[in-house]
Design a protein with these regions (language model features):
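Conserved C-terminal structural/oligomerization subdomain of aldehyde/semialdehyde dehydrogenase
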Residues: 36-40, 225, 262, 316, ...
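Glycine-rich loop-to-alpha-helix module at the N-terminal edge of alpha/beta enzyme cores
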Residues: 36-126
């Protein structure tokens, strides 16, 4: 095991320079698979945030003085550097977040690159329009950068979700202060270095690491921040929204989920159960859109439970660095305690624990894939986001019953529908309260389609052209022709 003096020290990245935190404090970053220290990370302060905001504000003019086509080329160079350093980025993400290296190589890093390339293509396509109002005036609109953006990034997909915020903001001409999650900062810091190498001017992309209660709160309160974008828990999202109200910052929130996966009796059960297992056990269930509620029609309920349990037992839990591993650890000891606490809650509420529900090994935050049967809609394990590999299988009687149960939580991020009846799947998709509905598939996202929810799942959308609106302000211009 490395001692603290052996660990690499990661400073803040502000205005193109690596800076020690003003407090001089560093925290130990932990590998969740081994519980061993892997790095020392700067603990930023409110003063460090202020320095970063001033750097970002000054860099706005520099970034917007660069022709849009050249900004696009810079972002494409960054995408190329990410691709050239894919192995390094994947190794950092796997080490820091406990994610299986095979999944990170296949999805996380390529998806982040795809997002950046997509928005690089937007740089010279952010247009206003001429709006005919009266014959003696030329009236038109412009879209201008919203300004300085604070992006607060979660720990479950650090680089991928970080890029959902960074790429469109940069394409729109904004500058950023990125606050990665305290426990998964490494890929954000490396991205900041690659951005400078690609030609992103100093101050355009700043990385300030540290605690949410310090760095996050300072970003929320700072009057120099024009826009906040956050992915995380509803409780933190509420606090951010309340804090941002003090100076009327624009806010986008992507919060929790308790997504329902509806399996009707005419569904292809092989495909449905395979996708249901992936939908809850992928990334150890630490996914906002995880299909944690599996709603099965009474005619196929027992078969769905049996098949799902078999798939849960077949999941290869273990070392994230091993190519055959399909599920790694939970992110932290605290998250493991939360998940195991919900297992006990489910049992005490009367649900049937079919498989899993225990810690794996003595080192690392591993928990067996877990399946509960005979779950009632009102139970806490059916209503509350667990953020772990815990599936609740709920029985329904008919289409109306399924929709009632699916819509019966505070969340509305995503849902899945499995049926061979074309009329049914369209009816159910229409009636489900969800930002995304998958039909006879589950879990896909793409930067070209909007992503987000409502209620405790947040508000606003990321991805696609909607994100361009998130990071720009419209301006109306009147020119009197006859003057």
């Amino acid at each position: 095991m490395e001692t603290e003096t052996d660990l690499r020290r990661h400073d803040l990245l502000i205005d193109g320079k690596r800076l020690p935190p003003g407090t001089g404090e560093y925290s130990i970053d932990i590998n969740p698979a081994t519980e061993e220290p892997i790095a020392l990370v700067a603990q930023g302060s409110a003063a460090d945030v202020d320095t970063a905001v001033h750097a970002a504000r000054a860099a706005l003019k520099v970034w917007n003085a660069i022709r849009a086509a050249e900004r696009a080329r810079i972002l494409m160079r960054l995408a190329g550097l990410m691709r050239a350093n894919l192995d390094e980025l994947a190794a950092l993400e796997s080490l820091d977040a406990g994610k299986p290296i095979s999944a990170v190589m296949r999805q996380d890093i390529p998806a982040a690159i795809d997002t950046l390339e997509y928005y690089a293509g937007w740089c010279d396509k952010i247009n206003g329009q001429v709006v005919p109002v009266r014959p003696d005036a030329l009236t038109y609109t412009l879209r201008e950068p919203v300004g300085v953006v604070a992006a607060i990034v979660p720990w479950n997909f650090p680089l991928m979700i970080g890029m959902w915020k960074i790429a469109p903001a940069l394409a729109c001409g904004c500058t950023l202060i990125v606050k990665p999650a305290e426990i998964t900062p490494l890929t954000a810091l490396r991205l900041g270095e690659l951005a400078l190498e690609a030609g992103v001017p100093p101050g355009v992309l700043n990385i300030v690491t540290g605690k949410g209660r310090v760095v996050g709160d300072a970003l929320v309160a700072h009057p120099g921040i024009d826009k906040l974008t956050f992915t995380g828990s509803p409780s933190v999202g509420r606090g951010i929204l309340q804090g941002a109200a003090g100076n009327f910052k624009r806010v986008t929130l992507e919060l929790g989920g308790k997504s329902a996966n509806l399996i009707f009796p005419d569904a292809n059960l092989d495909n449905a159960v395979r996708a249901a297992a992936s939908g809850i056990f992928f990334n150890t269930g630490q996914v906002c859109s995880a299909g944690s509620r599996i709603l099965a029609h009474r005619d196929v309920y027992d078969e769905v439970v049996e098949r799902l349990a078999a798939r849960a037992k077949a999941v290869k839990v273990g070392d994230p660095a091993a190519r055959e591993t399909s599920m790694g650890p939970l992110i932290s000891a605290a998250q493991m305690k939360t998940v195991l606490g919900y297992v006990e809650t489910g049992r005490s509420e009367g649900a049937s624990l079919v498989t899993g529900g225990v810690r794996v090994g003595e080192r690392g935050f591993f928990v067996e894939p877990t399946v509960f049967a005979n779950v009632e809609h009102e139970m806490r394990i059916s209503q509350e986001e667990i953020f772990g590999p815990v599936a609740s299988v709920i029985r329904f009687n008919d289409e109306a019953d399924a929709i009632r149960i699916a819509n019966g939580t505070l969340y509305s991020l995503a849902a899945g529908v499995w049926s061979a009846d074309i009329g049914r799947v369209h009816r159910v998709a229409r009636d489900l309260r969800a930002g995304t509905v998958w039909i006879n598939t589950y879990g896909y996202t793409d930067v070209r389609l909007p992503w987000g929810g409502s209620g405790d799942s947040g508000f606003g959308r990321e991805h696609g052209d909607v994100a361009i609106e998130n990071f720009t302000e419209p301006k109306a211009v009147w020119l009197a022709i006859d003057q």
